[in-house]
Each structure stands twice: as C-alpha cells, then as structure tokens.
UniProtKB/Swiss-Prot annotation:
Entry-linked PANTHER family: ALANINE RACEMASE, ALANINE RACEMASE, CATABOLIC-RELATED
Protein name: Alanine racemase
Domain of life from the UniProt record: Bacteria
SMART domains xrefs: Ala_racemase_C
Cofactor: pyridoxal 5'-phosphate
Catalytic residues in the record: 40, 263
One GO term describing the cellular component: cytosol
Pathway: Amino-acid biosynthesis; D-alanine biosynthesis; D-alanine from L-alanine: step 1/1
N6-(pyridoxal phosphate)lysine modifications at: 40
EC numbers for this chain: 5.1.1.1
Species for this entry: Streptococcus pyogenes serotype M12 (strain MGAS2096)
SUPFAM superfamilies hit by this protein: Alanine racemase C-terminal domain-like, PLP-binding barrel
A biological-process GO annotation: D-alanine biosynthetic process
Family as reported in the entry's similarity comment: Belongs to the alanine racemase family.
Amino acid sequence: MISSFHRPTVARVNLQAIKENVASVQKHIPLGVKTYAVVKADAYGHGAVQVSKALLPQVDGYCVSNLDEALQLRQAGIDKEILILGVLLPNELELAVANAITVTIASLDWIALARLEKKECQGLKVHVKVDSGMGRIGLRSSKEVNLLIDSLKELGADVEGIFTHFATADEADDTKFNQQLQFFKKLIAGLEDKPRLVHASNSATSIWHSDTIFNAVRLGIVSYGLNPSGSDLSLPFPLQEALSLESSLVHVKMISAGDTVGYGVTYTAKKSEYVGTVPIGYADGWTRNMQGFSVLVDGQFCEIIGRVSMDQLTIRLSKAYPLGTKVTLIGSNQQKNISTTDIANYRNTINYEVLCLLSDRIPRIY
C-alpha cells in the first residue's frame, strides 16, 4: 500500500521517547542483562528501520517475526544480532546464514525435515523455543531439548540461546505465570548442555517480574510507551507514548434536524449542527467500530458520527472551524489527551492491535 503524503493524515513517531522508554526499563532490570528490542510488525507500526537505528547504541540485538523482517533490517545496515521469533523452515536456511540471522527452532520435526532435505546448519545461530504453557510453538521436555541441541550441533549449528514466552505476565493473577516459570526452570535444570543465553522476559515480565529475569529480555510494547496490561496494572515507572496520530478538517458544513450522515444512515441529526469531515478511515486502520468515539479539535472532544468509511469519517463540531484545523486522533491537543489504550478499551481490544492496524497508507513522520 502506498503512503499518502498528499493528505493531512500522519503518524508522528518520537524516537527520543522510545530511547528513553528503553533506558527506563534497563535501569529497572538487573545489571548485565542483554536487551533485545522487539521490532516485529514494523516495530508495532512505528517503523522498524527507524526504531532499530535509533536504538542501535542501547540494545544488544533485535527480535522480528519472520525472515523478511530480518532481511529488511540487514538491508538497512543494521549489523547487530537479529533473532527471528517465528519458525523458519529449513528451505530458507541458506538466506538466514548468508545474512547472519539467528533463527528459532521449536521441534524435533524440524530436524527430521532438515535431514530429509539434506540441509546443513554450518554457520547457523539458533535459539531453541520451549513451550512452557503458551501452547503455540516449542518443545515440552528436557529430553526433547537435549536431543534437539545434540542434533543441531551434529548439523553444525551454534545453539546460542533457549527461551520461552509467558501467557499471563501482564495479569494480576500470577498463578499461570508461576506455573510456566517453574516449568521452564525445571526444564533448564535438566539440560546437559545449557545454551549461553536464557530468556523468558517480554515487556510485562521485565517490568512486573524483574526478579525472574534470566540473562536477556525482549522489550516490545513498553519501548513504544504503552502499558502491556492496558490499564489493569500500574506501571512501576512512567513511559512516554511514542506515536501520535493527527489529521485536519477538509470539509465543514451545517446540517439540519433530520439530516443523516454516513453509510446505513446510522446517524440522524436531532438539531442543526456543524459536521466536519476528516480524511482517515478503516483502510488506514481506523476501524468501523470507532463510531461514537471522540477525537480532539481545538482542545475539545468531538464525537465521530455516522459510520467510519474506507477513507473518511465525520465528526460533530461545536462551531464552523476553518478548513485545515488540526484533528488529533491519538495524542494531546491543548491539555486534553487520547491514548492508544483509550482506543483499545473502546474497541474492546488491546493497545498492541490498535498500533499494528495503522496501515502503511499513513506516513510516519520522525
């Protein structure tokens, strides 16, 4: 999708805020712990290349979702370690090795397939994934992990790390978290040849369970200034939300009582009122269920009326503002603020999803 630079809808990304957020977490965790910046999904919509470059002096490496995301960073000149968190099938190994990209291996079936395809792992750096209770990918016993590590070494791989992922680190009830932690610790204790790096801490674990950190952390949503729990748990230190979203009024008119607005005529004016049109819609990630939510104009909350269209939405105004008047969808406007978490709560989803749905059609300004 092409970025639309010739309309007023833009996302502004504060790279300094991201750097300061990472620094705040690093002060909170034990000394000597390695930091991986999680920049998958285009750095949660913030721009993977720009964020990675900004964090280059602060972090030890990066985590991405797939090989294409890793190659994007390499092609941009990022020379630190890049770990693919998802599973890379053996037929892509050559490209990973050629670009010094670390891969995750999560099953003995992977080894069987690599041998079937006569793939060697010489020069390949690997982190082994353990399923301690998340239920997606990973091995479930020390016996399996020992066999996998031995097999990988036979194929020439460097098994650098082993890791797991917690399902409920961002929840007040830590029963499941503790079950997973004990499972992982027991599995690690049963290894015959423990890898150099052991990591289980995502953003939530890093800030609320810092006493359980091994020797590396993976910092995702906290880097971008958002609470991993939404608003369920209090942050131990302040964060700065790094992305703001703004547009401008491109059309303003008066409508009369009985006039309708939008597809499906879901809004009917009860009296004469001013309506403004803003050039952002569900193709930009501003979803249709945002009808009834508010944006900020001149420090005032203005309700979205009528259905959100593909490219536009309409808002009720208190007066006839001039064309070009700033509209804030995420961020501050004259001491009033709309956070990504506010939007997530309205949509009954999580702040991660709100950011990741912001499409490439919205230019990112740094």
